[in-house]
Amino acid sequence: MSIPNHLRYSEEHEWVKTEGNQVVIGITHFAQSELGDIVFVELPEVGATLEANEPFGSVESVKTVSELYAPVSGKVVAVNEELSDQPELVNESPYEGAWMVKVELSDASEVEKLLTAEKYAEMTNQD
């Protein structure tokens, strides 16, 4: 699967899509393929505050449990409730249906510090 150019990426394999003063966050195709079949997703509540580079939830697969790290700081304004009933969406549609949280940014400049698609591809040895 190609890496979408319109997104930014963290070194912990989260993607960020900017929508005005908010961002949508999910995990990358690379991350879900490394994890294997996702069986459970734990996400924060609406209203929770995220701090960049700090854990904000977890993803459980048949192989392991992996923490999710916030690529940016801000307040959670929406959570993808579908993932509690259909965690497999993370495997099936990591960049669309399986977004995890929407966050109102506290510092928009944090987005610019994230990796471009090209840099993320280099980091993960994907073309």
Swiss-Prot record:
Key words of the record: Lipoyl
Chain ranges of the Lipoyl-binding domain: 22-104
Cofactor(s) demanded: (R)-lipoate
A Pfam cross-reference name: GCV_H
Free-text comment on the cofactor: Binds 1 lipoyl cofactor covalently.
InterPro entries reported in the protein's UniProt record: 2-oxoA_DH_lipoyl-BS (IPR003016), Biotin_lipoyl (IPR000089), GCV_H (IPR002930), GCV_H/Fam206 (IPR033753), GCV_H_sub (IPR017453), Single_hybrid_motif (IPR011053)
Residues annotated with N6-lipoyllysine modification: K63
Entry's Gene Ontology cellular component terms: cytosol; glycine cleavage complex
Coiled-coil ranges per UniProt: none
GO biological process, one term: glycine decarboxylation via glycine cleavage system
Signal peptide: none
PROSITE patterns in the record: BIOTINYL_LIPOYL (PS50968), LIPOYL (PS00189)
Subunit-structure text: The glycine cleavage system is composed of four proteins: P, T, L and H.
Reported function: The glycine cleavage system catalyzes the degradation of glycine. The H protein shuttles the methylamine group of glycine from the P protein to the T protein. Is also involved in protein lipoylation via its role as an octanoyl/lipoyl carrier protein intermediate.
UniProt similarity note: Belongs to the GcvH family.
Protein name (record): Glycine cleavage system H protein
